[in-house]
């Protein structure tokens, strides 16, 4: 047989590092969700602004928007 499956699990204790101890408080809120919509409307507003920005850049690149006094030569 080319492969072998081992059913043994490691029996040692996990190592506790300094970095793990420092970062553990940041993970204490894992799984908790604030009730309600929270900042979702604000996020939607900024996503819409970003979409408008991207469309504007695309229109300038495609020369769909003519800019007076600015010579564009690609």
UniProtKB/Swiss-Prot annotation:
One of its GO terms (molecular function) is phosphate ion binding. It comes from the Eukaryota. It comes from Adiantum capillus-veneris. The gene is psbH. The keyword Thylakoid applies. One of the components of the core complex of photosystem II (PSII), required for its stability and/or assembly. PSII is a light-driven water:plastoquinone oxidoreductase that uses light energy to abstract electrons from H(2)O, generating O(2) and a proton gradient subsequently used for ATP formation. It consists of a core antenna complex that captures photons, and an electron transfer chain that converts photonic excitation into a charge separation. It is a single-pass membrane protein. This is Photosystem II reaction center protein H. NCBIfam families: PRK02624.1 (NF002728).
């Amino acid at each position: 047989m080319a492969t072998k499956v081992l059913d043994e699990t490691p029996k040692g204790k996990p190592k506790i590092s300094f970095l793990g101890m420092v970062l553990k408080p940041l993970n204490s809120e894992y799984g908790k969700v604030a009730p309600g919509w929270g900042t979702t409307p604000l996020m939607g507003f900024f996503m819409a602004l970003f979409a408008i920005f991207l469309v504007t850049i695309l229109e300038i690149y495609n020369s769909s928007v003519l800019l007076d006094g600015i010579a564009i030569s690609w």
